[in-house]
């Protein structure tokens, strides 16, 4: 797997494109906004988008979803408890950026322990509530990489003061789902630089 990355949208959300180069297919994680930038990244890879996976439903992670979905026809995956974020602006908090963001419902609802088999790759779904009720991280074990959304950042954690947030739940999620992984597992956050489990464990 090769991972491509752009910062997209006014909050510089990390959008990742995980590509299986052997078959020319890939998975987009968190198309946060600025569709033209995401489109250019995809075109440069020459890979086909076969799935769009969302770590959670906040507007800064789904801002370009409608355009990407229309352009690719790829199915959308989101945690069950964040599903209504796609259709309800009050849940995705788009009013914070002066918009009323609405999308069609997701094609697939993700549950803790699910294994998403996409583009010839397997991603383990870890429910990590705390930043949102339905937040998820996705672990690609062969590459020792976690697409972590806003659960954890380099030397920080996601906000818990927004609707559906819980500091206690977030800390529990990080301890039981992420800190049990090997030190050299990379954490690809929703904002800011990449970190590792080992680095965050030593903090």
List each language-model region with its residue ranges.
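Active-site HxH/HxHxD metal-binding segment of metal-dependent hydrolases
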Residues: 33-118, 203
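Short, glycine/acidic-enriched loop or turn micro-motifs at the edges of active sites
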Residues: 22-23, 33, 59, 134, ...
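Conserved S/T- and glycine-rich ATP-binding loop of Class I adenylate-forming
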Residues: 18, 55, 128
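Structured loop/turn residues at beta-strand edges in well-structured enzyme cores
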Residues: 1, 47, 119-121, 183
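Conserved beta-strand hairpin/beta-sheet module of binuclear metal-dependent hydrolase folds
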Residues: 1-45, 137-149
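Metallo-beta-lactamase
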Residues: 92-95, 121-203
